[in-house]
Amino acid sequence: MKGQVVRIIAGFYDVVDLKNRKLYPLLRGSGLLRLNETSPIVGDFVDFEEKGFIKKIYERKNQLIRPKVANIDQALVFISIREPNFSSLLLDKFLLVIEAKNIPVILLVTKIDLDSNFENLLLDYQKMNYNIFFINNKKNEIPVELKAELEKKLNFVIGQTGVGKTSFINNFLDKKFAIQEISQTLNRGKHTTRVVQIIEKENFRIIDSPGFSSFSYSEISKNEIRNAFKIFKKFSSDCKFRSCFHFQEKTDQCGIKRALKDGKIPENRYKNYLYFLGKYEKKNY
């Protein structure tokens, strides 16, 4: 049978049959997979036996290393306005990894009730044509347009701890996962998600994952960083040299610098790019 891995705990795999959506828990990897040092990850499409082993892992259309997930249709990137405070650097760190894998992005902005100026903080991202939804979890309201965007797709949830991911999932899927209040001393939420898993209800599927501290962009090469952002891909074709890193090159030789000068790329996005490039050079992830 063909299925998809929805959860992994202590070397056991829970798999959903793609045909009838029945859950088959506690499967193991076959001896051949172990011999080849190959292990399934959440999101993998696999061939499996009803009461036994996973026999085959199908080719992945995309994959993240930390957390280990595969075959994502789109990413739901959560960012809060306050508690924790909005940070374009943190948001761009998430987008750097997601867009490097060519995964479509939806930005979900939470805690909008804590700052009346919330829309202005996202102006640069609106200008870059990101798909943005403003969410108030306290009102338990999910925009109809957002539901339509998520239907029949595998949606990967990512964001700093404490931004309201679990509250959103509870509201959206009408499930009750553990929620903890923001830690005032650390200005961040306590981790409420401990395993990567696919949560499913009707035509909606969401990959919930551990919070910010386990999310890494160290898997990205220097070459990937230079054109990871979607808007950089758009203008980098105008660079004179294919190896352009949009840093030391002259403006007339760099499509990114010209777009920056013309106001087509926000200055803050370019500054964040230089920060990530510098972090890579220092090997300080």
Curated annotation (Swiss-Prot):
Family: Belongs to the TRAFAC class YlqF/YawG GTPase family. RsgA subfamily.
Binding site for Zn(2+): C239, C244, H246, C254
Keywords tagged on the record: Cytoplasm, GTP-binding, Hydrolase, Metal-binding, Nucleotide-binding, Ribosome biogenesis, RNA-binding, rRNA-binding, Zinc
EC numbers on record: 3.6.1.-
Compartments it resides in: Cytoplasm
HAMAP family the UniProt entry points to: GTPase_RsgA (MF_01820)
Protein name: Small ribosomal subunit biogenesis GTPase RsgA
Binding of GTP, residues: T110, K111, I112, D113, G159, Q160, T161, G162, V163, G164, K165, T166, S167
GO terms for biological process, alphabetical: ribosomal small subunit biogenesis
Name of the top EC class for this enzyme: hydrolase
PANTHER family to which the protein is assigned, alphabetical: SMALL RIBOSOMAL SUBUNIT BIOGENESIS GTPASE RSGA, SMALL RIBOSOMAL SUBUNIT BIOGENESIS GTPASE RSGA 1, MITOCHONDRIAL-RELATED
Names of required cofactors: Zn(2+)
NCBIfam families linked to this entry: ribosome small subunit-dependent GTPase A (TIGR00157)
Molecular function terms, GO-annotated: GTP binding; GTPase activity; metal ion binding; rRNA binding
Organism placement in taxonomy: Bacteria, Bacillati, Mycoplasmatota, Mycoplasmoidales, Metamycoplasmataceae
